[in-house]
Amino acid sequence: MIARRNPEPLRFLPDEARSLPPPKLTDPRLLYIGFLGYCSGLIDNLIRRRPIATAGLHRQLLYITAFFFAGYYLVKREDYLYAVRDREMFGYMKLHPEDFPEEDKKTYGEIFEKFHPIR
């Protein structure tokens, strides 16, 4: 079993997650999760042997809203975890610059072969 990095009690979103910008409401991940909510409403109708697309439109809207709301916080948590990982990685790179030497920048002329048109 892997031990947690810090002994702080487990929280879904710590206070330092508030400093990050919120996810956009048109984020494709949120739209996908909302679509999953719509599909779950359709599957619910299918399981209960109701007309699939037309029965319980209010229920389908509730599923979409609930999934979108839960997805918003899941995306926010994912962004926070990526930010923590990036902070640790860049901190390590700053403390150990000898492990990450600067590479010489090449021009496009050095990368690509010379072009000779053939007619």
Curated annotation (Swiss-Prot):
It comes from Homo sapiens (Human). Belongs to the complex I NDUFC2 subunit family. GO terms for molecular function: NADH dehydrogenase (ubiquinone) activity. Keywords: Disease variant, Electron transport, Membrane, Mitochondrion, Mitochondrion inner membrane, Primary mitochondrial disease, Respiratory chain, Transmembrane, Transmembrane helix, Transport. This is NADH dehydrogenase [ubiquinone] 1 subunit C2. The gene is NDUFC2. GO terms for biological process: aerobic respiration; mitochondrial electron transport, NADH to ubiquinone; mitochondrial respiratory chain complex I assembly; negative regulation of non-canonical NF-kappaB signal transduction; negative regulation of reactive oxygen species biosynthetic process; positive regulation of ATP biosynthetic process; positive regulation of mitochondrial membrane potential; proton motive force-driven mitochondrial ATP synthesis. It is linked to Mitochondrial complex I deficiency, nuclear type 36: A form of mitochondrial complex I deficiency, the most common biochemical signature of mitochondrial disorders, a group of highly heterogeneous conditions characterized by defective oxidative phosphorylation, which collectively affects 1 in 5-10000 live births. Clinical disorders have variable severity, ranging from lethal neonatal disease to adult-onset neurodegenerative disorders. The chain crosses the membrane at residues 56-75.
